Amino acid sequence: MSELVTGVCRALSHPARRELLRALSSHECDVGNLSEGCGLDQPTASKHLAALRAAGLVSVRIDGRRRCYSLAHEEIVRPMLELLGRLEALEEQLEGAAPSPARAG
């Protein structure tokens, strides 16, 4: 697997990063509003945004003292988010259908 693909997969592996990407899928946002909307403290959100930026999934625009983030390559990121959402829904469905350990035997 290429370094690019590995980096993107690694960046998408953390739930907070996926949540940040979902928040950015509707509009550009500064780190303060992103962290508040995703329930993260600002340093944690900044750390995750740096990882997403390093993977090429988000871009940043400096506006005075504010850093405004947006999706980079929306045509790629949006379908990835849709696929991840479907996988998460499938996981929840499978967890709900799994027999409890007491009944499984």
Residue spans for each PLM region:
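N-terminal helix-turn-helix DNA-binding core of bacterial DNA-binding proteins
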Residues: 3-43, 63-76, 105
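Residue-level detector of secondary-structure transition/capping positions
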Residues: 28-29, 53, 84
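Alpha-helical residues within the helix-turn-helix
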Residues: 36, 53-54
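Amphipathic alpha-helical dimerization/coiled-coil segments
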Residues: 1-4, 22, 72-105
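Short, hydrophobic-biased segments on the C-terminal half of alpha helices
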Residues: 49-50
